[in-house]
UniProtKB/Swiss-Prot annotation:
Skewed-composition ranges (Basic and acidic residues): 250-282
Gene name tied to this protein: Mtfr2
Organism in which the protein naturally occurs: Mus musculus (Mouse)
Low complexity bias (residue ranges): 232-244
Pfam families noted in UniProt: Mito_fiss_reg
Compartments it resides in: Mitochondrion
Protein name per Swiss-Prot or TrEMBL: Mitochondrial fission regulator 2
GO BP term, example: mitochondrial fission
Key words, A-Z: Mitochondrion, Phosphoprotein
Role summary: May play a role in mitochondrial aerobic respiration essentially in the testis. Can also promote mitochondrial fission.
Residues bearing the modification Phosphoserine: 137, 304, 340
Compositionally biased region (Pro residues): 219-231
Mitochondrion as UniProt keyword: yes
Family per similarity comment: Belongs to the MTFR1 family.
Biological classification of the source: Eukaryota, Metazoa, Chordata, Craniata, Vertebrata
Region (Disordered): 191-286, 298-322
């Protein structure tokens, strides 16, 4: 009997699960600073706001920064003929979908982003080229045009101007080099146009001599002199009488065409010589090929006392060896294609180390 009494007393002293949970809740509330006596008031009175639930009470006690709440104000379509006085109307929950994309919600703004100055509170007139967001017409989202101009960057304009100046300077340099090359060719061939003597120096040459500081790092080396063409007589044929006017121009044209033909022939011969020299360069030199012959080492081969190489005994593989099975199957399949015995790796060899044969078909 005393044992039963002690067991019953111990059972009564054990805490129930509900009391354990209540103790945990009270400790949590005391940790967050919530009075324990307020629990009964929460259960009896149905308060509103932050005292409606335990979660709200705990959240009110915690030092958390509240999130920013967006306030939506939908601006109606205002034409230029209408007045600036208007009333903002509150949108429905269907307009909240446009918040995901800021570009589509161009007509929405937060309350903290409103202009503070009174003169800036006026709404710009509605232009047909600038479309606003409309939930009923999703096709306008893709066809929206932007009329806002980008700010002008002065640094970019300066860079563009500098690049243009450098480009003009390079063009003048190229023109001067071409003119010098033409004069050199005409002097070498002995053909000088009389009309070129009275021409003043071109602007390209003057720009090259006056403005050398624009791009000092872009100075090009002088071109190599062209190969001298074969000499030919500049005198007109004696049978033709010299006439002022048409006869003189005819002789000049004939000389020019003859010069072009000879220059083309010289270019062809130069190209042929160049191609021949290139072919000779591509052919390998035998001295370079044979200079490393002494460094070649042969593989040592076992020889018999008579001097003949010792032939290795062929290993007889078992019937269940996978290498022998595969080799026998391949031999039976390709035996009819090549039955010659003079090949190094013939199909009749039973060595598993022989190289595979390639089919002719």
């Amino acid at each position: 009997m005393p044992r039963d009494g002690t067991n019953e007393q111990r059972f009564l002293e054990l805490p129930s699960p509900m009391s354990f949970i209540l103790n945990i809740l009270r400790n949590v509330l005391e940790y967050f600073g919530v009075p324990v006596d307020q629990d009964l008031l929460i259960c009896q009175n149905k308060n509103c706001g932050s005292a409606r639930s335990i979660v709200r009470i705990i959240g009110r006690r915690l030092p958390l920064k509240p999130c920013r709440r967006p306030h939506f104000e939908l601006i109606p379509h205002v034409n230029s003929t209408e007045s600036d006085d208007y009333e903002l109307r509150v949108p429905s929950f269907a307009d909240v979908l446009c918040v995901a994309n800021d570009e589509e919600a161009s007509c929405l703004r937060f309350r903290h982003s409103l202009w503070q100055k009174k003169e800036e509170r006026k709404i710009a007139p509605f232009y047909p080229s600038k479309l606003t967001w409309d939930p009923s017409s999703p096709g306008l989202r893709q066809n929206k045009t932007e009329t806002d101009d980008l700010p002008v960057n002065e640094a970019a304009i300066k860079k563009i101007a500098a690049l243009e100046d450098e480009l003009t300077f390079l063009r003048s340099q190229i023109a001067a080099i071409v003119a010098m090359q033409d004069l050199r060719e005409s002097r070498e061939t002995g053909f000088i146009d009389l009309s070129d003597e009275q021409v003043p120096p071109s602007s390209a040459t003057t720009g090259l001599s006056v403005e050398p500081d624009h791009a000092p790092s872009v100075v090009l080396p002088p071109p190599p002199p062209p190969p001298p063409p074969p000499q030919f007589s500049l005198q007109p044929p004696s049978s033709l009488p010299m006439q002022p006017g048409s006869a003189n121009t005819h002789d000049i044209d004939s000389l020019a065409t003859e010069m072009e033909r000879q220059l083309s022939g010289v270019k062809k011969t130069d190209d042929s010589h160049h191609s021949k020299s290139q072919r000779l360069r591509d052919v390998p030199n035998m001295l370079d090929v044979l200079k490393d012959v002494n460094k070649v080492r042969l593989r040592p081969v076992e020889r018999s006392p008579g001097g003949r190489p010792v032939q290795k005994r062929k290993r007889r593989s078992s019937e269940w060896d996978p290498v022998s099975l595969i080799s026998n199957a391949l031999k039976q399949k390709f035996a009819f294609q090549d039955d010659s015995f003079d090949r190094e790796n013939s199909s009749w060899e039973c060595s598993p180390f022989s190289s595979p044969e390639t089919s002719r078909f």
